Amino acid sequence: GYEPSMEITCTDGNLQIRRIHEDGTEEKTVQQVKHPGDAIRQILKEYKSPVLENMPTFTGGLVGYFSYDYIKYSEPKLKLTDETVQDFRDMDLMLFDQVIAFDHYRQKVLLITGVMLEDLEASYQKAEKKLQEMADLIRNGEKEEFPPLELESEIKPQFPKEKYCKMVEKAKHYIHEGDIF
């Protein structure tokens, strides 16, 4: 994806949506939700990508992650403890309607942008302009040098080895019993 048009995050039911408009302005909404999936489904109703032959399977949409803790929205009976809760957002997604895809098999770069159907002619012209800007960036963009990454702190395991091994054995038992998968 290239230049997200929206960022969606949720932690403990606190859903934040940041829309990034073409002119660079931003609109942020925050709301308390019981299940963030409802908001995601509503957003996805506005964005549909056709499946086209000779195109990658991903031509735009949501990219990101759902943490392990996201299960609490679908299975509220599960009581997550401080020991099991990770220090991550429950979900962190970005909406991309511009994609630079590398087809390694055909040795081609594909530039993709979404077109909204409300005002098709104006939307098509905007898409042409975006595609030209993307092509110019690839052809003329400057290579950015980054310094080597350095760890800011020592990597430490979250649990001692013995405790971790016990947790794995317990999980295997639950899998065998059909309680988890």
Feature locations, PLM:
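Short hydrophobic "helix-edge" motifs at membrane interfaces and signal-peptide entry regions
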Residues: 54-57, 167-169
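Short acidic (Asp/Glu) patches
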Residues: 36-53, 76-87
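Short, flexible active-site-proximal loops enriched in glycine and acidic residues
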Residues: 48-56, 139-146
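Extended accessory regions or peripheral subdomains of proteins
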Residues: 1-32, 68, 72-181
